[in-house]
């Protein structure tokens, strides 16, 4: 359990170097922080600040092409948390991180924000994304990464998932897989009752 004074969400958990690591979203801190599990999943210790001076959401790491890649949506000024995708690359997941030369690599409220770990499928990379065109949590998408290198980034959304009749909530947030299972999390938008 990790408790801090700032907002925490989207715990990106991964294994590397024989350890379990986590990068939680904590955009209010202005940093992207790395934690190491001391007693998974209950105990965590702060290991490093990966990036400082950035208001970023849903940082997601991927090892690809001999490098580590960090995907995150960056909020600049009064903009959205969901529409501007930035990339960084590094020789190791601890850094040092170099911003992609074409940041932001994508401006699209329908597919910039991450919705879970990137997975290898059918010889390609699939990136779960949040489709916020109709509001936060309106839908998820599955984007195939077409190009990822130091010169360019490209993706194509191939599938969209919306909350259906069997979904108890009204919003979708994250798609993840572990142990042969796939998980989708979301929330229910509370109805506002007008008093009169």
Short names for language-model regions:
Residues 1-196:
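Carbohydrate-active catalytic/glycan-binding domains of CAZyme proteins
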């Amino acid at each position: 359990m990790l408790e801090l004074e700032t907002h925490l969400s989207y715990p990106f958990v991964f294994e590397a170097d024989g350890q379990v690591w986590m990068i939680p979203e904590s955009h209010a801190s202005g940093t992207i922080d790395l934690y190491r599990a001391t007693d998974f999943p209950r105990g965590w210790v702060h290991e490093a600040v990966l990036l400082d001076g950035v208001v970023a959401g849903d940082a997601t790491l991927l090892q690809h092409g001999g490098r580590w890649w960090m995907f995150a949506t960056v909020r600049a000024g009064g903009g959205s948390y969901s529409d501007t995708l930035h990339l960084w690359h590094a020789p190791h997941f601890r850094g040092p991180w170099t911003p992609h030369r074409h940041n932001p690599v994508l401006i699209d409220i329908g597919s910039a924000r991450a919705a879970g770990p990137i997975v290898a499928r059918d010889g390609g990379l699939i990136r779960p994304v949040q489709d916020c065109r109709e509001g936060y949590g309106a839908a998820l998408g599955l984007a195939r990464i077409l190009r990822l290198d130091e010169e360019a980034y490209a993706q194509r959304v191939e599938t969209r998932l919306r909350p259906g009749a069997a979904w108890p909530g009204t919003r979708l947030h994250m798609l993840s897989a572990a142990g042969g299972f796939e998980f989708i999390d979301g929330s229910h938008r509370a109805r506002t009752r007008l008093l009169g």
